[in-house]
Amino acid sequence: PLIVIANHPYGILDGLTLGHILEHTRVDFRILANSVFRKAEEINRVVLPISFDEDKEAMALNIATRKRALSYLEDGGAIGIFPGGTVSTAVRPFAKPMDPGWRNFTARMIAKSGASVLPIYFDGHTSRLFQIASHTHNTLRMGLLIKEFGRRVDTPVRVSIGEPISSGALSAFAKDSKGMMDFLRKATYELSPDPLKSFDLGYEFEERHRM
């Protein structure tokens, strides 16, 4: 079994690109992604939907999806996921966009499945307009995601693929979900072709996840 993790700088483009990478390397893969991705016909068939809402329906959906994902991994499949759970956003509008802290949901799935983990780094970020809008109006932010995707059509995406990390190498984090995700987040950002000066957390939209 394999879990592919990646940063999430674009929202739509990196989701499609991750699907493209997995499609050309594995026949047995699924992607855990926001249910909105099911509207994209080309990847709907491989999406296991997750929701970041805080209601009972979202909780039930996520529990069901995790069960399906674990079952898929038990059969030796591959799962792709963006552990940050949201598009990389700068803490301040003119700072560097980064993922927030990575969700423990992924760590629990890694620990339960015993899967190896493959980190992938997507280089780049959304426009400054999107970053500013992200701090002012959530509906505008979501609307601009489509424009961000259109802006990048037919442009290259720099991708760095790391070495697989065995379940044994992560065994020290078996009871430390946050520690595991901090380790994997840093390992992913270290793949940047232009070394980063900082691995600071990006803006966290969900109050329950704020430090």
Label each PLM-derived region with a short phrase.
Residues 3-58:
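Catalytic core of membrane glycerolipid acyltransferases/transacylases, capturing the structured
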Residues 1, 39, 203-205:
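A short beta-turn/loop motif at secondary-structure boundaries
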Residues 1, 16, 41, 51-54, ...:
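Solvent-exposed, flexible loop/coil residues
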Residues 62-211:
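Non-catalytic C-terminal accessory region of glycerolipid acyltransferases
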